[in-house]
Amino acid sequence: MAKNKFNKSWLQDHLTDPYVKMAQKEGYRARAVYKLSEIDEQDHLIKAGMTIVDLGSAPGSWSQYVRNRLTELGKSNPKIESGKPDGQIIAIDILPMEDIADVSFIQGDFREEEGLAALEALLPKSAEGKVDLVLSDMAPNLSGVGVADSARMAFLAEIALDFATAHLKPEGALLIKCFNGSGYSQIVESFKKVFKTVASRKPKASRAKSSEIFLLGKNLKPPK
């Protein structure tokens, strides 16, 4: 009975959520797009000419936003074809994702050799395979057990950080989703070891009752 009440409560929240309605109206696949857009507006993450990797991209709203943002920036560059993005977007997920124009999608696991090789084959040779921005909205399937869910989220954060450390340009940035709970402080410390600047963000589109928080790292520290 409690589960049914929870499901009904979630459905009611979902149906009345202004961000859900806005996403439907604007053609985005998920309300999560507004979390990224708010952080981008605050921190100016997305710039013309960037190569951006979207980890755990399905259903695709973050890739949609990046594509639209780079296309808007491309309007001021006469070398960019009309309606095309000024930059490169690579998305990867173990789940399928419907095509998005100008987004290179790989269905695979970047932790495994085959998936990583497919992703790296798309990286710009001119930049020695390095990228400007890595995004991760990855989240585990929730069990409802707080400690277990936090541990799974911490694992996803660490693998995103490992990927970014290996593939970012020195001035690059990483934005990931976390849970502000058990293990969060350790993730922050891991970020501080890698990035010169670390900040947390709780966008308005992130539900107040959710422990969800976003962690942003900018500018890699030189390797020791």
UniProtKB/Swiss-Prot annotation:
Signal peptide: none
Pfam families assigned: FtsJ
Keyword set, alphabetical order: Cytoplasm, Methyltransferase, rRNA processing, S-adenosyl-L-methionine, Transferase
Active-site residues, as the UniProt record annotates them: 177 (proton acceptor)
Source organism superkingdom: Bacteria
Transmembrane segments: none
InterPro entries the UniProt entry points to: RNA_methyltr_RlmE (IPR050082), RNA_MeTrfase_FtsJ_dom (IPR002877), rRNA-MeTfrase_E (IPR015507), SAM-dependent_MTases_sf (IPR029063)
Catalytic reaction(s) noted: uridine(2552) in 23S rRNA + S-adenosyl-L-methionine = 2'-O-methyluridine(2552) in 23S rRNA + S-adenosyl-L-homocysteine + H(+)
Gene Ontology MF term list: rRNA (uridine-2'-O-)-methyltransferase activity
UniProt subcellular location: Cytoplasm
Cell membrane in keyword set: no
Gene3D superfamilies: Vaccinia Virus protein VP39
GO cellular component, one term: cytoplasm
Family that this chain belongs to: Belongs to the class I-like SAM-binding methyltransferase superfamily. RNA methyltransferase RlmE family.
HAMAP family: RNA_methyltr_E (MF_01547)
Name of this chain's protein: Ribosomal RNA large subunit methyltransferase E
Organism this protein belongs to: Polynucleobacter asymbioticus (strain DSM 18221 / CIP 109841 / QLW-P1DMWA-1) (Polynucleobacter necessarius subsp. asymbioticus)
Gene giving rise to this polypeptide: rlmE
